[in-house]
A protein has these predicted regions:
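Conserved C-terminal structural/oligomerization subdomain of aldehyde/semialdehyde dehydrogenase
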Residues: 1-100
């Protein structure tokens, strides 16, 4: 389904039917992009298990709020690195190895 494969910016809600959790994860991951996603469930542990399987840089579980201290950035063709938190600082560092 096209809407699930494009990176859309804006207030968009897509409702897509799925057979089971494996199918839902397959649909969520079937994209060239992976900036963020969301999982809603009455069972928080189950929602977290699904969120861990999603190939996105951020996943809100049950509408979790944005955390400015958490690293932010996408997977695959989304974004250009990480912002915020220690991973955001790493974007400005270069590693050097010296052998004597």
């Amino acid at each position: 389904m096209t809407v699930a494969q494009e990176e859309i910016f804006g207030p968009v809600l897509s409702i897509i039917g799925y057979e089971d959790e494996d199918d839902a994860v397959r649909i969520a991951n079937d994209s060239l992009y992976g900036l963020s996603g969301g999982v809603w469930s009455a069972d928080q542990d189950r929602a977290i298990a699904v969120a861990r399987r999603m190939r996105t840089g951020a996943v809100d579980v049950n509408g979790g709020s944005f955390n400015i201290a958490a690293p932010f950035g996408g997977y695959k063709q989304s974004g250009y690195g990480r912002e915020n938190g220690p991973y955001g600082i790493d974007e400005f560092l270069q590693t050097k190895s010296l052998q004597l």
